[in-house]
Amino acid sequence: MTTKIKSEEISSIIKERIENFNINIDISETGKVIAYADGVAKVYGLNNVMYYEMVEFDTGDTGIAFNLEESSVGVVVLGSGRTIKEGTSVKRLKKLMKVPVGDAIVGRVINTLGEPIDGKGAIEANEYRFVEEKAPGIMARKSVHQPLQTGLKAIDALVPIGRGQRELIIGDRQTGKTTVAIDTIINQKGQDVICIYVAVGQKESTVAQVVRKLEEHGAMDYTVVVNAPASFSAAMQFLAPYTGVTIGEYFRDNARHALIIYDDLSKHAVAYREMSLILRRPPGREAFPGDVFYLHSRLLERAAKLNDELGAGSLTALPIIETQAGDVAAYIPTNVISITDGQIFLETDLFNSGIRPAINVGLSVSRVGGAAQIKATKQVAGTLRLDLAQYRELQAFSQFASDLDESSRKQLERGQRMVEILKQPPYSPLSIEKQVIIIYAGANGYLDNIPANKVIKFESELYPFLEAKYPKIFEDISVKKAIDKETEAELSKALEEFKINFGA
């Protein structure tokens, strides 16, 4: 027996079907690789792709649209790109590059893309940020006024660094640039400062050594390492500092403090030059492209001290530049010197003569850090730069003149002891209270009778003596941030007592 379907039922079924009709069409704009070499693909067919947009190859590799030409697009490949060849399909992702940020990545070693490379499992990040962001404007900033202590006497006394400052570390290879940066990270322990170390174009073994050193001193607990070694493509090396600064900005914008080290921007500029030349952009001075200044200025301008309305967070940058035979007048060094708020100049001759950290006090400056220096340091190190300059002058003169008058001889001897005081072994940063005490002792003649070669021994024995018998001195300097008459009297008494007992 056949059942008849009423016409109303048919129409209601058709209506229902039409209402629930859903078709999933995935529209993606694709193109084809027409040429590929040295980590750069020339792609045809991505007519609507935007500058800096992410694209995906059907091999699984990702890239960034870097050159937008009339008939093709120049794409820099992130990753090895070994399987990309002519004819490989490429599709637009319609998004810009983002990296994970937040506390989840603190203590980790990551690559340029924010992927973990330390074998400690996946990163569970709650927030992702664009790697290219605008730097804070003038009104969003506040002048630098809080100190960021490095733990190095020569820097904290003579070229002080403030939170939110950009201070360049510049010098030839093997002069201790990375050591200064690592010391600064170690000294941030307990200071509530998150540190980011960006390694660009370094050897994997060198970065592993840095990570091991940070772990030894318990500094990895508040540090992120972004690694783009020499084996990575030029694009990965070029983007690494931007990944690092994006991570730092998260803390800066959340009313916290961060420190970022770029090791080093010379290799960063070389990676950018390599990329630009492969993309056939016109070369300029030293074959660098015309926008190499903008490359570094937009990166370093993102370090800032924010105003109180925005939370008063800060991001301090310590870029490193490697010079060739002390040539600070080369293209990249002069560019970065003009962008930063001062520079710490390390010299090969000083390093080889045993003065370490090998800081050339005459050429090193801090343009804004003076406002951040605590009063106690200002009191003891006020004339130190001038005294050292006069000592260097006298030293040069005394090589030719044998008969020096009494005051010149005393000045020469005092200078020798001050140079000894500023020496410091690597990876042993000092608290600001200890720095103030030893510089006070040197500047006020307490070391004049101590042989120059015994100054380091004097210093190493002085701190335990004061901690045991005069702990209040450390406390007073720490709390008051200055040396008042009472503290000075106590310190003088302690130094006199120690000198009598010191077995030189």
UniProtKB/Swiss-Prot annotation:
InterPro entries: ATP_synth_asu-like_sf, ATP_synth_asu_C, ATP_synth_asu_C_sf, ATP_synth_F1_a_nt-bd_dom, ATP_synth_F1_asu, ATPase_a/bsu_AS, ATPase_F1/V1/A1_a/bsu_N, ATPase_F1/V1/A1_a/bsu_N_sf
EC code: 7.1.2.2
GO cellular component, one term: proton-transporting ATP synthase complex
Any one GO molecular-function label of the UniProt entry: proton-transporting ATP synthase activity, rotational mechanism
Binding site for ATP: 171-178
Topological relation to the membrane, as annotated: Peripheral membrane protein
Reaction catalyzed: ATP + H2O + 4 H(+)(in) = ADP + phosphate + 5 H(+)(out)
Entry keyword set: ATP synthesis, ATP-binding, Cell inner membrane, Cell membrane, CF(1), Hydrogen ion transport, Ion transport, Membrane, Nucleotide-binding, Translocase, Transport
Subcellular location: Cell inner membrane
Family recorded in the similarity comment: Belongs to the ATPase alpha/beta chains family.
Subunit structure, interactors included: F-type ATPases have 2 components, CF(1) - the catalytic core - and CF(0) - the membrane proton channel. CF(1) has five subunits: alpha(3), beta(3), gamma(1), delta(1), epsilon(1). CF(0) has three main subunits: a(1), b(2) and c(9-12). The alpha and beta chains form an alternating ring which encloses part of the gamma chain. CF(1) is attached to CF(0) by a central stalk formed by the gamma and epsilon chains, while a peripheral stalk is formed by the delta and b chains.
PANTHER family named in the record: ATP SYNTHASE SUBUNIT ALPHA, MITOCHONDRIAL
Role noted for this protein: Produces ATP from ADP in the presence of a proton gradient across the membrane. The alpha chain is a regulatory subunit.
NCBIfam families: atpA (TIGR00962), PRK13343.1 (NF009884)
UniProt-recorded name of the protein: ATP synthase subunit alpha
Organism name: Helicobacter hepaticus (strain ATCC 51449 / 3B1)
